[in-house]
Protein backbone atom coordinates (compact mmCIF):
# COMPACT_ATOMS: atom_id res chain seq x y z
CA UNK A 1 0.00 0.00 0.00
CA UNK A 2 1.16 3.51 -0.82
CA UNK A 3 0.01 6.72 0.87
CA UNK A 4 0.21 10.08 -0.90
CA UNK A 5 -0.61 13.27 0.99
CA UNK A 6 -2.48 15.61 -1.36
CA UNK A 7 -3.32 18.30 1.19
CA UNK A 8 -3.06 19.25 4.89
CA UNK A 9 0.55 18.05 5.01
CA UNK A 10 2.44 21.36 4.82
CA UNK A 11 -0.59 23.36 5.97
CA UNK A 12 -3.75 23.02 8.02
CA UNK A 13 -6.48 22.86 5.36
CA UNK A 14 -7.19 20.80 2.24
CA UNK A 15 -7.23 17.38 3.92
CA UNK A 16 -6.90 14.76 1.16
CA UNK A 17 -4.94 11.51 1.31
CA UNK A 18 -4.62 8.97 -1.50
CA UNK A 19 -4.27 5.30 -0.53
CA UNK A 20 -3.24 2.99 -3.36
CA UNK A 21 -2.68 -0.72 -3.74
CA UNK A 22 -1.93 -2.63 -6.91
CA UNK A 23 -5.67 -2.97 -7.53
CA UNK A 24 -7.40 -0.07 -5.78
CA UNK A 25 -7.28 3.68 -5.17
CA UNK A 26 -9.29 5.43 -2.46
CA UNK A 27 -9.28 8.86 -0.81
CA UNK A 28 -9.45 9.76 2.86
CA UNK A 29 -11.22 13.15 2.80
CA UNK A 30 -11.27 15.67 -0.04
CA UNK A 31 -11.14 19.05 1.66
CA UNK A 32 -10.93 22.60 0.40
CA UNK A 33 -7.85 24.76 0.91
CA UNK A 34 -8.75 27.85 2.94
CA UNK A 35 -7.00 30.91 4.27
CA UNK A 36 -6.32 33.42 1.49
CA UNK A 37 -5.51 33.94 -2.18
CA UNK A 38 -2.63 31.45 -2.19
CA UNK A 39 -4.87 28.74 -0.73
CA UNK A 40 -7.71 29.63 -3.12
CA UNK A 41 -5.32 29.15 -6.03
CA UNK A 42 -4.52 25.62 -4.82
CA UNK A 43 -8.20 24.69 -5.20
CA UNK A 44 -8.06 25.60 -8.89
CA UNK A 45 -5.11 23.30 -9.61
CA UNK A 46 -5.62 19.78 -11.03
CA UNK A 47 -5.75 16.96 -8.53
CA UNK A 48 -2.46 15.01 -8.34
CA UNK A 49 -4.40 11.93 -9.47
CA UNK A 50 -7.15 11.11 -11.96
CA UNK A 51 -10.52 11.57 -10.17
CA UNK A 52 -12.09 8.96 -12.48
CA UNK A 53 -9.69 6.31 -11.09
CA UNK A 54 -10.73 6.84 -7.47
CA UNK A 55 -13.09 4.09 -6.32
CA UNK A 56 -14.44 5.82 -3.23
CA UNK A 57 -13.91 8.54 -0.65
CA UNK A 58 -13.97 7.72 3.06
CA UNK A 59 -14.87 10.97 4.81
CA UNK A 60 -13.98 11.89 8.40
CA UNK A 61 -16.43 14.78 8.91
CA UNK A 62 -18.34 17.66 7.32
CA UNK A 63 -16.06 20.65 7.86
CA UNK A 64 -15.22 22.28 4.53
CA UNK A 65 -11.45 21.80 4.90
CA UNK A 66 -12.19 18.05 4.90
CA UNK A 67 -15.12 17.77 2.45
CA UNK A 68 -15.15 21.02 0.44
CA UNK A 69 -13.59 19.72 -2.78
CA UNK A 70 -15.96 16.76 -3.15
CA UNK A 71 -18.13 18.63 -5.70
CA UNK A 72 -14.96 19.52 -7.63
CA UNK A 73 -13.91 15.85 -7.53
CA UNK A 74 -17.27 14.83 -9.04
CA UNK A 75 -17.13 17.71 -11.53
CA UNK A 76 -13.77 16.37 -12.74
CA UNK A 77 -14.83 12.76 -13.19
CA UNK A 78 -15.24 10.92 -9.86
CA UNK A 79 -18.21 8.54 -9.82
CA UNK A 80 -17.58 6.38 -6.75
CA UNK A 81 -19.21 6.16 -3.33
CA UNK A 82 -18.64 8.74 -0.60
CA UNK A 83 -18.75 6.89 2.72
CA UNK A 84 -19.44 8.83 5.93
CA UNK A 85 -21.48 8.60 9.12
CA UNK A 86 -25.23 9.27 9.11
CA UNK A 87 -24.85 12.64 10.83
CA UNK A 88 -22.09 13.69 8.44
CA UNK A 89 -24.34 12.81 5.50
CA UNK A 90 -27.03 15.12 6.90
CA UNK A 91 -24.53 17.93 7.44
CA UNK A 92 -23.04 17.53 3.96
CA UNK A 93 -26.32 18.55 2.37
CA UNK A 94 -26.16 21.88 4.18
CA UNK A 95 -22.41 22.45 4.03
CA UNK A 96 -21.80 21.62 0.37
CA UNK A 97 -24.82 23.56 -0.93
CA UNK A 98 -23.78 26.56 1.16
CA UNK A 99 -20.22 26.27 -0.13
CA UNK A 100 -21.47 26.11 -3.72
CA UNK A 101 -23.60 29.21 -3.12
CA UNK A 102 -20.60 31.08 -1.71
CA UNK A 103 -18.45 30.13 -4.72
CA UNK A 104 -21.20 31.35 -7.07
CA UNK A 105 -21.51 34.70 -5.31
CA UNK A 106 -17.74 35.21 -5.11
CA UNK A 107 -17.46 34.50 -8.85
CA UNK A 108 -20.27 36.98 -9.59
CA UNK A 109 -18.54 39.66 -7.52
CA UNK A 110 -15.14 39.03 -9.14
CA UNK A 111 -16.70 38.99 -12.62
CA UNK A 112 -18.34 42.40 -12.06
CA UNK A 113 -15.00 43.71 -10.85
CA UNK A 114 -13.23 42.23 -13.89
CA UNK A 115 -15.80 43.72 -16.26
CA UNK A 116 -15.10 47.21 -14.97
CA UNK A 117 -11.38 46.58 -15.53
CA UNK A 118 -11.89 45.13 -19.01
CA UNK A 119 -10.97 41.60 -17.98
CA UNK A 120 -12.75 38.29 -18.56
CA UNK A 121 -15.39 36.96 -16.13
CA UNK A 122 -14.49 34.07 -13.82
CA UNK A 123 -16.24 30.77 -13.23
CA UNK A 124 -17.06 29.50 -9.73
CA UNK A 125 -14.98 26.61 -8.40
CA UNK A 126 -18.29 24.74 -8.28
CA UNK A 127 -21.98 25.56 -7.95
CA UNK A 128 -24.99 24.58 -5.86
CA UNK A 129 -25.99 22.26 -8.70
CA UNK A 130 -22.57 20.58 -8.54
CA UNK A 131 -23.07 20.08 -4.81
CA UNK A 132 -26.50 18.54 -5.35
CA UNK A 133 -24.99 16.14 -7.90
CA UNK A 134 -22.31 15.17 -5.38
CA UNK A 135 -24.87 14.25 -2.72
CA UNK A 136 -26.12 11.43 -4.97
CA UNK A 137 -22.89 9.53 -4.23
CA UNK A 138 -23.08 9.77 -0.43
CA UNK A 139 -23.44 6.43 1.38
CA UNK A 140 -24.13 6.78 5.14
CA UNK A 141 -22.78 4.15 7.54
CA UNK A 142 -23.37 3.82 11.29
CA UNK A 143 -20.59 4.15 13.86
CA UNK A 144 -18.87 0.88 14.87
CA UNK A 145 -20.14 -0.98 11.80
CA UNK A 146 -17.51 -2.89 9.81
CA UNK A 147 -18.11 -2.54 6.07
CA UNK A 148 -16.23 -3.48 2.90
CA UNK A 149 -15.29 -0.83 0.36
CA UNK A 150 -13.66 -3.32 -2.03
CA UNK A 151 -12.26 -6.86 -2.00
CA UNK A 152 -9.11 -5.75 -0.11
CA UNK A 153 -10.29 -3.05 2.29
CA UNK A 154 -12.65 -2.84 5.26
CA UNK A 155 -13.54 0.23 7.32
CA UNK A 156 -15.03 1.16 10.69
CA UNK A 157 -16.08 4.67 11.76
CA UNK A 158 -15.37 5.55 15.42
CA UNK A 159 -16.60 8.67 17.19
CA UNK A 160 -13.92 11.40 17.05
CA UNK A 161 -15.71 13.78 19.43
CA UNK A 162 -14.90 16.77 17.19
CA UNK A 163 -18.31 17.73 15.75
CA UNK A 164 -21.58 15.89 15.22
CA UNK A 165 -20.83 12.85 13.06
CA UNK A 166 -17.05 13.20 13.11
CA UNK A 167 -15.14 9.94 12.80
CA UNK A 168 -11.80 8.32 13.41
CA UNK A 169 -11.37 5.94 10.48
CA UNK A 170 -9.99 2.43 10.97
CA UNK A 171 -9.00 0.87 7.65
CA UNK A 172 -7.85 -2.73 7.20
CA UNK A 173 -6.01 -3.56 3.96
CA UNK A 174 -5.30 -7.14 2.87
CA UNK A 175 -2.16 -7.26 0.76
CA UNK A 176 0.58 -9.85 0.10
CA UNK A 177 -1.00 -12.38 2.49
CA UNK A 178 -0.94 -9.79 5.30
CA UNK A 179 -3.53 -7.44 6.77
CA UNK A 180 -2.40 -3.91 7.66
CA UNK A 181 -4.39 -1.53 9.82
CA UNK A 182 -4.31 2.20 9.03
CA UNK A 183 -5.91 4.71 11.39
CA UNK A 184 -6.87 8.19 10.16
CA UNK A 185 -7.73 10.44 13.09
CA UNK A 186 -9.48 13.23 11.20
CA UNK A 187 -9.94 16.14 13.60
CA UNK A 188 -10.05 15.01 17.23
CA UNK A 189 -12.17 16.39 20.04
CA UNK A 190 -11.16 16.63 23.68
CA UNK A 191 -12.39 14.81 26.75
CA UNK A 192 -15.26 15.66 29.08
CA UNK A 193 -17.22 18.13 26.97
CA UNK A 194 -20.93 18.57 27.83
CA UNK A 195 -22.44 17.96 24.36
CA UNK A 196 -20.08 15.74 22.35
CA UNK A 197 -18.95 12.26 23.30
CA UNK A 198 -15.30 11.66 24.10
CA UNK A 199 -13.13 10.59 21.16
CA UNK A 200 -12.73 6.83 20.84
CA UNK A 201 -9.41 5.44 22.04
CA UNK A 202 -7.81 3.35 19.28
CA UNK A 203 -5.40 0.87 20.82
CA UNK A 204 -3.54 -0.59 17.86
CA UNK A 205 -2.46 0.37 14.34
CA UNK A 206 0.27 -0.35 11.82
CA UNK A 207 0.06 3.14 10.32
CA UNK A 208 -1.41 6.34 11.79
CA UNK A 209 -2.35 9.49 9.87
CA UNK A 210 -3.05 12.05 12.57
CA UNK A 211 -4.31 15.61 12.80
CA UNK A 212 -1.62 17.60 14.64
CA UNK A 213 -2.62 21.27 14.34
CA UNK A 214 -2.67 21.70 18.13
CA UNK A 215 -0.36 18.80 18.91
CA UNK A 216 2.32 20.99 20.49
CA UNK A 217 -0.04 22.95 22.75
CA UNK A 218 -1.01 22.33 26.35
CA UNK A 219 -4.78 22.50 26.74
CA UNK A 220 -6.17 23.91 30.00
CA UNK A 221 -8.52 21.89 32.19
CA UNK A 222 -12.25 22.39 31.56
CA UNK A 223 -12.70 24.21 34.86
CA UNK A 224 -9.97 26.70 33.91
CA UNK A 225 -11.54 27.31 30.49
CA UNK A 226 -14.96 27.90 32.07
CA UNK A 227 -13.46 30.40 34.52
CA UNK A 228 -11.72 32.23 31.67
CA UNK A 229 -14.95 32.36 29.66
CA UNK A 230 -16.90 33.63 32.67
CA UNK A 231 -14.30 36.34 33.27
CA UNK A 232 -14.57 37.48 29.62
CA UNK A 233 -18.39 37.59 29.83
CA UNK A 234 -18.31 39.62 33.05
CA UNK A 235 -15.80 42.11 31.63
CA UNK A 236 -17.76 42.44 28.38
CA UNK A 237 -21.16 43.01 30.03
CA UNK A 238 -19.59 45.51 32.43
CA UNK A 239 -18.45 47.86 29.67
Residue ranges of each PLM-predicted region?
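Catalytic cores of nucleotide-enabled group-transfer and carboxylate-activating enzymes in metabolic
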Residues: 2, 16-25, 46, 207, ...
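Catalytic core of the metallo-beta-lactamase
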Residues: 2-6, 20-21, 141-199
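Pre-active-site segment of Zn-dependent metallo-hydrolases
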Residues: 9, 21-80, 84-136, 188-197, ...
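Cap/insert and terminal regions of metallo-dependent hydrolase folds
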Residues: 81, 168, 188-239
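Flavin (primarily FAD) cofactor-binding/catalytic cores of flavoenzymes
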Residues: 13
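Short coil/turn connectors at secondary-structure junctions
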Residues: 22-25, 52-54, 78-79, 151-153, ...
Amino acid sequence: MKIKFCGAATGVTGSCHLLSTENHKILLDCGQFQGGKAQDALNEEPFPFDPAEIECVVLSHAHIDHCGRLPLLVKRGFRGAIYCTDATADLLEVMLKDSGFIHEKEAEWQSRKNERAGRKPVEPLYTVKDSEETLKYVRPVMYDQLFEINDEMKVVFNDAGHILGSAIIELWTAEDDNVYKTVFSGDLGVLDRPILRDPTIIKKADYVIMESTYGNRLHPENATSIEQLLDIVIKTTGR
